[in-house]
């Protein structure tokens, strides 16, 4: 039994859901109400002392950080290694894209939008410039490429599509970046679990209305 503690609106949680779908793992989903402090209860702290989501528990083995969970699911349950190839160079590029998503692209979203959504802070133009810079980088990575890392779908695409779709519901103009826009339209068609990802995006969209 693979237990999955999550929120549907969370981009990192959605990347795990899509990865699980891609490798055929059924998740026993457990909604965690952060506003009610469920992540701070002793029983959850025992599982994840960092009290973050997503958190996966696979037959007693607990893991958090979405990109680590993605890789674990592919390595343990993938019927092939196509989503995370064993070739060191291919894997290195995928890792770079995952770290880019975590430290640059998704981080730029969090830095700009979260203060507005959760603290009612005014928009910070400097933080918005970081978003634009992140999209310029991604646009460059995708020049002449259908996928984010290599010539087929990988966990890098899945992580990035979870993030980029969240930018879409925040009304960021993805279409200004031609390569990103082309990649994104293709990713919607080829990423397993896209429909559930989009449903989660629409949950998150309520914060912007």
From Swiss-Prot:
One of its GO terms (cellular component) is cytoplasm. One of its GO terms (molecular function) is DDT-dehydrochlorinase activity. Its EC number is 2.5.1.18, 4.5.1.1. It comes from the Eukaryota. SUPFAM superfamilies: GST C-terminal domain-like, Thioredoxin-like. PROSITE patterns: GST_CTER, GST_NTER. The keyword Endoplasmic reticulum does not apply. Gene3D superfamilies: 1.20.1050.10, Glutaredoxin (3.40.30.10). Keywords: Detoxification, Lyase, Transferase. One of its GO terms (biological process) is glutathione metabolic process. Pfam families: GST_C (PF00043), GST_N (PF02798). Residues 87-208 form the GST C-terminal domain. Homodimer. This is Glutathione S-transferase D1. It comes from Drosophila melanogaster. The lineage of its organism: Eukaryota, Metazoa, Ecdysozoa, Arthropoda, Hexapoda. The gene is GstD1.
């Amino acid at each position: 039994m693979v237990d999955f503690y999550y929120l549907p609106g969370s981009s990192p949680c959605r990347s795990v859901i899509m990865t699980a779908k891609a490798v055929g793992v059924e998740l026993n989903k457990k909604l965690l109400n952060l506003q009610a402090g469920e992540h701070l209860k002793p029983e959850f702290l025992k599982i994840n002392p960092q009290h973050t989501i997503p958190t996966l528990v696979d037959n007693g083995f607990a893991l958090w950080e979405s990109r680590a969970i993605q890789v674990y699911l592919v390595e343990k349950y993938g019927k092939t290694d196509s989503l995370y190839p064993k070739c060191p160079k291919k894997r290195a590029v995928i890792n770079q894209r995952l770290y880019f998503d975590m430290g640059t692209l998704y981080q730029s979203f969090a830095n700009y939008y979260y203060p507005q959504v959760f603290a009612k802070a005014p928009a910070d133009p400097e933080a918005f410039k970081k978003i634009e810079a992140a999209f310029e980088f991604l646009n460059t990575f995708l020049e002449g490429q259908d996928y984010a890392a290599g010539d087929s779908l990988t966990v890098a695409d899945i992580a990035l599509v979870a993030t980029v779709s969240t930018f879409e519901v925040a009304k960021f103009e993805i279409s200004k970046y031609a390569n990103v826009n082309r990649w994104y339209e293709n990713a919607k068609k080829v990423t397993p679990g896209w429909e559930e990802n989009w449903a989660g995006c629409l949950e998150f969209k309520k914060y912007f209305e």
